[in-house]
């Protein structure tokens, strides 16, 4: 009955928007989600374990030459009428001189049940059962020399109904689960594991925790050294390289380019000729979605071809403006109260041919993990942290008014780095950072054969989004210290 009520509410809202003369196009989503939040610390029982329900409706409205997004957790028809009125009014307030163009001929009718096998769907298990599995997984690390451990588990079983004024009607299901683990003592190590295969993600948890323990033991037993900031030949392990590449490809988002926050355009040199990057959808991956919030089927994008930018990340508006096609890159936020954003999905870096030992011999510093990136350009940092309407034309208008922010650089804290002496592991680096320019991959010296996948979450304009990147190790020159 609850799902039917959400579908009825979404249908009411799309019909209301179809009756608005000012509305050129609109997309409506009805959300029915059951969530679990579990935290396990040093106690042999969960610190917290709660189940949450979400029932709501959102709309993305094209009117008055602008685009606006609104969300409501009320399914009452009067409240939805007010939601529609406010969305149209906000579009009028944000109106631009350039009318928004959209694809009025695109129509989809489909259903997609996600990537969780029927027996692995998350709503088939209770919160207590999930909490017991979390406690069992960390029990061998509690009260040991491994240091303090914390495990965070988040999941949601979500059904979404997507409707638009073209007549599209799509139903999707997603069973998404993620673990975040921290082990702290003489050193602190972190990891994240996420997927959309439902309860099957639990099968990968022991391996993640075992790897976390190995990194912790390796770090605390190593001699420690400090480094003065200097340009060095650096070996980035696959997950460190993935973190770097994921941060750099955000400069290829069409709204970032429109705002003047990117030094790149399509056709520019992004990296060395060794570098090829695709943006993909991997079935069961943490960022896997069958459709984006514009009801576009998610399809692969050739992002960087032998070092040259082959495409940008687009929504339907920016794609039509540039006479190209959108590929389903408008991702919903983890919290639907915040607008969807143009964003990378699964960033896939093609492997190289260099064996691990040769990579190590080429570098003087090796880095296993990088922390969250920080943009040193104050203008870029402030704009990406602020709320911005999900409208590329509004972004372009912001770019015209924004002062020149100066040089773009990104800084990453090192979470697991050490010196290399003739390819062998030396002292551990503590308290150091890596700082790079957006063009750092032009100096890419070597790519490894073996790839690994990093998952996590990132914020863009206050919207929290999942990320996923698969990369080989790489050697490049950058500032470390």
What is each residue range found by the language model?
Residues 1-481:
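N-terminal small-residue-enriched
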């Amino acid at each position: 009955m609850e799902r039917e009520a959400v579908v009825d509410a979404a249908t009411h809202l799309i019909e209301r928007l179809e009756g608005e003369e000012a509305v050129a196009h609109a997309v409506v989503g009805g959300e029915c989600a059951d969530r679990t939040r579990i935290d396990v610390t040093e106690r042999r029982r969960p610190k917290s374990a709660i189940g949450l329900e979400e029932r709501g409706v959102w709309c993305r409205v094209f009117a008055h030459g602008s685009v606006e997004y609104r969300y409501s957790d009320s399914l009452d028809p009067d409240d939805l009428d007010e939601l529609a009125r406010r969305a149209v009014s906000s579009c009028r307030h944000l109106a631009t001189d350039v009318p928004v163009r959209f694809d009025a001929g695109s129509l989809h009718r489909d259903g997609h049940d996600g990537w969780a096998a029927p027996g692995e769907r998350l709503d088939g298990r209770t919160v207590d059962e999930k909490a017991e599995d979390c406690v069992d997984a960390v029990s061998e690390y509690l009260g040991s020399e491994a240091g303090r451990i914390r495990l965070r588990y988040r999941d949601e079983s979500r059904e979404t109904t997507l409707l638009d004024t073209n007549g599209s009607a799509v139903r999707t299901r997603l069973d998404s689960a993620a673990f975040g683990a921290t082990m702290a003592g003489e050193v602190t190590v972190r990891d994240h594991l996420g997927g959309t295969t439902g309860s099957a993600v639990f099968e990968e948890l022991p391996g993640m925790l075992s790897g976390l323990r190995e990194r912790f033991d390796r770090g605390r037993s190593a001699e420690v050294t400090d480094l003065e900031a200097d340009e060095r030949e650096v070996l980035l392990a696959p997950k460190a390289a993935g973190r770097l590449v994921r941060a750099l490809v955000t400069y290829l988002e069409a709204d970032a380019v429109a705002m003047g926050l990117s030094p790149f355009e399509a056709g520019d040199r992004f990296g060395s000729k060794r570098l090829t990057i695709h943006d993909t959808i991997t079935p069961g991956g943490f960022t896997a979605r069958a459709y984006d919030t514009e009801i576009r089927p998610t399809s692969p994008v050739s992002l960087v071809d032998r070092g040259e930018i082959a495409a940008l990340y687009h929504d339907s508006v920016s794609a039509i403006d540039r006479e190209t096609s959108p590929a389903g890159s408008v991702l919903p936020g983890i919290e639907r109260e915040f607008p969807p954003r143009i964003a990378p999905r699964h960033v896939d870096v093609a492997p190289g041919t260099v064996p691990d030992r040769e990579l190590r011999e080429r570098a003087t510093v090796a880095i296993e993990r990088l922390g969250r990136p920080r943009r040193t350009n104050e203008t870029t940092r402030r704009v990406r942290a602020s709320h911005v309407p999900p409208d590329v034309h509004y972004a372009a208008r912001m770019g015209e008014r924004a002062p020149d922010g100066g040089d773009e650089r990104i800084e990453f804290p090192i979470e697991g780095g050490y010196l290399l002496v003739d390819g062998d592991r030396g002292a551990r680096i503590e308290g150091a950072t890596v700082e790079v320019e957006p063009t750092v991959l032009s100096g890419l010296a070597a790519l490894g054969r073996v790839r690994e996948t990093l998952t996590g979450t990132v914020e863009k304009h206050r919207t929290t989004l999942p990320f996923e990147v698969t990369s080989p190790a790489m050697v490049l020159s950058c500032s470390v210290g």
